[in-house]
Regions:
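Conserved catalytic SET/PR domain of SAM-dependent protein methyltransferases, capturing the structural core
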Residues: 1-124
Length: 124
């Protein structure tokens, strides 16, 4: 669940991106898993979902420790960067540096799922 105010807009990186609605200071905890809001599926549970749900989630979910993590807010639109302005640390996505109001919020997909980054790089 995002812990900061954001909005979606056209991204110069890829399609739609997540942008900061206000300045975010360095070190701010920006996202964390919230059970009941975010959802983890075992691979067995994921495979039992209807095909349209699986196809949708392939674009917006992450593989983490052998499970599929699906989130429902703007965070699912965060784009990859080799030089992201966030870092994954102790279960939180944290501002690596101050993020300006209106700046796109980016993550390094390799911190979540190395396969995501490989798929992204093949699209270039």
């Amino acid at each position: 669940m995002l812990l900061v105010k954001t909005y979606l807009d056209k991204s110069p990186i890829h399609g739609v991106g997540v942008f900061a609605s206000e300045r975010i200071p360095k070190g701010t905890k920006m996202w964390r898993f919230v059970e009941g809001y975010d959802r983890c599926y075992s691979l067995k549970q994921f495979r039992k979902l209807p095909k349209p749900a699986r196809e949708f989630m392939k674009n917006y979910a992450y593989r983490v420790d052998g499970e599929v993590l699906f989130t429902v807010d703007n965070d699912r639109h965060m784009n990859h960067s080799d030089k992201p302005n966030t870092v994954l640390k102790s279960g939180y996505v944290i501002a690596r540096r101050a993020i300006r109001k209106g700046e796109e919020i980016t993550v390094d997909y390799r911190e979540f799922d190395p396969a995501l980054c490989a798929a992204f790089l093949k699209q270039k």
